[in-house]
C-alpha cells in the first residue's frame, strides 16, 4: 500500500471512529485487572497475531524487575550514523567507568597487526595467567562499539586474565568480511606469543555473531583453534529469522520493534555476499572440530532464536556446546553492572573460560 493510500485509509478510519466513539474504556493497570481471555489468532498465512498479559516475574532480582517494568517509547527518532556512534561511545565510556569502579583494571590503547585494540589488564593479574589471553569482539550492530569495555572489564577481572578487545573496522564503510579479517589478523599475531590452547575468543550480540564467523574462518584457513569460544546473544544465519526477532525489541516487550522483512539481516554489513555464505552464516557450514563453546541468552532476547538455533547446530556437529538461558531478561543484559543477573552471567562466562584454559 503506497503512502498516500495509507494516509487516506487512516483518515477514513479516524473519521469513522470519531462518529461512533463512546466513552473511552478504562485500560487495565495491572495484570490481575486484564481480561481473562485470549484474543490471539492465526491468520490465513499462518502468522500468529499475539495478545498476552505478561507480568514481571518474581523469578528475577528486584533491580531487574524495575528495568522490565520501565516502558520505552515505541517510536525512535531518526538518527544519523555519526550521532549513533557518538552516543554509543558516550554510553560505552559511562558504562565502562561504572564497571571499572567494581573491577579495577588498567586499559591501554594499542595496535596489533595494524588493528586498533583495547588491552584490559585486571588488577592483581597472577603470574600463572600471564601466558593466557582472552580476545573480545565487541557488540554494537557492526556499525559502532557498544561493548569493548563492558564486555571486557568484568570478564578480565573475574577470570583474572588479560583481555584484548578488537576495534575492528565497522560497516557500512567496511562491510563483511572486513571485521572478520581484522579479528583473524589479531588472532594470528597473538599466536606468535600465546599457545592456541591459552587463547579464548568471545563476544556479545554482533560480537557473538563475529565470534562464530571468525571460528568458521579459522577452520577454513586451517589455523589452530583457540581453547574455547563464547557466543553470547547471537545468530549464525543471515538468511532466516526465528520467532524472537518478531516478538522482542532491544528492550524485550517494550520499545521500538522492527519485525523481520524478506530482506536479509543487516544488508549494510552483508554487502553483496550470499546470506548463506558459510563464514557469514556459519550455520550453513561445517562446524565439526570447533572448540568448546558457551552460549548465553535470555527469554526476552531478540536474538534468543538465533542463539538456540546456532547452539543446536553446534551440538549436531559434535561440538561441546553449552547453553545458559536467563529468565525474562532482555538482549545482552549483562552490560549493566547494577543487575545481580549481570554479575551472575559474567561469572558464568569467566568460569567457563578459566576451566577451558586449564586453570
What do these predicted regions represent?
Residues 1-10:
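Bacterial N-terminal signal peptides that target proteins for export
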Residues 6, 84-85, 118, 169:
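Basic side chains
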Residues 9, 55, 87-88:
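Sequence-pattern detector for short linear motifs
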Residues 14-16:
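Short, linear, compositionally biased motifs with a strong N-terminal bias
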Residues 19, 23-43, 51-78, 97-359:
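Alpha/beta-hydrolase superfamily serine-hydrolase fold, recognizing
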Residues 76-93:
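Phosphate-/polyanion-interacting regions in eukaryotic proteins
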Amino acid at each position: 500500500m503506497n503512502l498516500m493510500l495509507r494516509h487516506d485509509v487512516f483518515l477514513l478510519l479516524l473519521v469513522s471512529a470519531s462518529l461512533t466513539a463512546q466513552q473511552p474504556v478504562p485500560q487495565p493497570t495491572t495484570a490481575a485487572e486484564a481480561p481473562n481471555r485470549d484474543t490471539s489468532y492465526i491468520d490465513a498465512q499462518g502468522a500468529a497475531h499475539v495478545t498476552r498479559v505478561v507480568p514481571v516475574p518474581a523469578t528475577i532480582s528486584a533491580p531487574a524487575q524495575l528495568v522490565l517494568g520501565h516502558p520505552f517509547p515505541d517510536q525512535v527518532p531518526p538518527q544519523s550514523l555519526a550521532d549513533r556512534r557518538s552516543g554509543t561511545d558516550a554510553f560505552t565510556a559511562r558504562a565502562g567507568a561504572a564497571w571499572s569502579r567494581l573491577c579495577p583494571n588498567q586499559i591501554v590503547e594499542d595496535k596489533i597487526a595494524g588493528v586498533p585494540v583495547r588491552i584490559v589488564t585486571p588488577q592483581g593479574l597472577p603470574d600463572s595467567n600471564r601466558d593466557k589471553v582472552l580476545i573480545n569482539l565487541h557488540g554494537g550492530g557492526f556499525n559502532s562499539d557498544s561493548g569493548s569495555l563492558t564486555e571486557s572489564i568484568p570478564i578480565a577481572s573475574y577470570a583474572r586474565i588479560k583481555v584484548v578487545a578488537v576495534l575492528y573496522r565497522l560497516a557500512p564503510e567496511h562491510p563483511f568480511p572486513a571485521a572478520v579479517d581484522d579479528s583473524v589478523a589479531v588472532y594470528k599475531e597473538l599466536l606468535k606469543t600465546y599457545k592456541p590452547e591459552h587463547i579464548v575468543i568471545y563476544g556479545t550480540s554482533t560480537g557473538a555473531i563475529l565470534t562464530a564467523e571468525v571460528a568458521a574462518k579459522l577452520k577454513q584457513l586451517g589455523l589452530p583453534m583457540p581453547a574455547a569460544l563464547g557466543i553470547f546473544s547471537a545468530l549464525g544465519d543471515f538468511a532466516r529469522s526465528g520467532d524472537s526477532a518478531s516478538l522482542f525489541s532491544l528492550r524485550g516487550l517494550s520499545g521500538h520493534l522492527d519485525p523481520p522483512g524478506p530482506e536479509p539481516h543487516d544488508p549494510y554489513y552483508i554487502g553483496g555476499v550470499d546470506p548463506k555464505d558459510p563464514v557469514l552464516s556459519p550455520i550453513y557450514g561445517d562446524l565439526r572440530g570447533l572448540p568448546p563453546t558457551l552460549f548465553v541468552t535470555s527469554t526476552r532476547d531478540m536474538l534468543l532464536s538465533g542463539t538456540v538455533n546456532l547452539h543446536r547446530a553446534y551440538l549436531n556437529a559434535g561440538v561441546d556446546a553449552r547453553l545458559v538461558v536467563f529468565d525474562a531478561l532482555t538482549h545482552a543484559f549483562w552490560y549493566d553492572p547494577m543487575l545481580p543477573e549481570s554479575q551472575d552471567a559474567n561469572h558464568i562466562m569467566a568460569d567457563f573460560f578459566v576451566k577451558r584454559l586449564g586453570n
